[in-house]
Amino acid sequence: MHCRLFRGMAGALFTLLCVGLLSLRYHSSLSQRMIQGALRLNQRNPGPLELQLGDIFIAVKTTWAFHRSRLDLLLDTWVSRIRQQTFIFTDSPDERLQERLGPHLVVTNCSAEHSHPALSCKMAAEFDAFLVSGLRWFCHVDDDNYVNPKALLQLLKTFPQDRDVYVGKPSLNRPIHASELQSKNRTKLVRFWFATGGAGFCINRQLALKMVPWASGSHFVDTSALIRLPDDCTVGYIIECKLGGRLQPSPLFHSHLETLQLLGAAQLPEQVTLSYGVFEGKLNVIKLPGPFSHEEDPSRFRSLHCLLYPDTPWCPLLAAP
């Protein structure tokens, strides 16, 4: 009874804070009182219940240039199934998207450039919004990812609730090496694993709380500058080099930088994330026959969605089993 009461309190706080915070532009110096209040609420919770989709905060990073070409596809497909858990982080206002998403569209003060500081600025916005939410898991994806909610929940349920968890797919088959800037123009060689942001990754709350000194607000951009690497690398650096944690590699996350055609149709429902794009000069998409042609559905996301959810109104009847 007490667990459910605390869960209800957390849900109410989440709704109020998100409406008040996420509908406005993000400011790098997010109110410390709001963060501390969320942390105190988390500490009062006597024990977690079984993980549910409603416990997961899903952040989608995008930019103005892709509002039409990418976001409409996501909103029509997987986001429609978990809209309450999904927040879109962008760099420019969009009245049409605002009407469709309401407070789930977060317009940051970050630059639209594809630069390390701009990317790190958005990641900091995602991270701080998660802290305020009070939810149990933070999952980051890009705007060219398809998220399978059932597979995501199933994966996260496998991890012990009392351990720090950082799960995703490494983009390299070895740790990355970086030069960490130190005082007096000195550098220190560091090595660590990181989950590629293009495939998505997840971090549980107790680990996220430990990351705050390096990842909250402007600290994330500063930390990224220390190693002069992008936002996803910075997450791995904080967890492995600053906190002594470890990446839990998972083959269920996928980016457009791998050969997606190698996944069989029978494997697709088991994957947590999928992607599409151009790789080595060729269109790189999952291999999935119908129900839409490649001209109608070049990303194959609509066909995948109909495979997973054949009851979707716009799916052809032949998609049903």
From Swiss-Prot:
It is an enzyme of class 2 (transferase). It is a single-pass type II membrane protein. Optimum pH is 5. The gene is Mfng. PANTHER family: FRINGE-RELATED. Glycosyltransferase that initiates the elongation of O-linked fucose residues attached to EGF-like repeats in the extracellular domain of Notch molecules. Modulates NOTCH1 activity by modifying O-fucose residues at specific EGF-like domains resulting in inhibition of NOTCH1 activation by JAG1 and enhancement of NOTCH1 activation by DLL1 via an increase in its binding to DLL1. Substrate binds at residues 70, 143. Residues 1-7 are cytoplasmic. It is found in: Golgi apparatus membrane. This is Beta-1,3-N-acetylglucosaminyltransferase manic fringe. The keyword Glycosyltransferase applies. One of its GO terms (biological process) is marginal zone B cell differentiation. GO terms for cellular component: Golgi membrane. Residues 28-321 are lumenal. The chain crosses the membrane at residues 8-27. The lineage of its organism: Eukaryota, Metazoa, Chordata, Craniata, Vertebrata. Glycans are attached at residues 109, 185. Its cofactor is Mn(2+). It holds the Pfam family Fringe. The active site is at residue 232. Keywords: Developmental protein, Disulfide bond, Glycoprotein, Glycosyltransferase, Golgi apparatus, Manganese, Membrane, Metal-binding, Signal-anchor, Transferase, Transmembrane, Transmembrane helix. GO terms for molecular function: metal ion binding; O-fucosylpeptide 3-beta-N-acetylglucosaminyltransferase activity. Optimum temperature is 37 degrees Celsius. Belongs to the glycosyltransferase 31 family. Its EC number is 2.4.1.222.
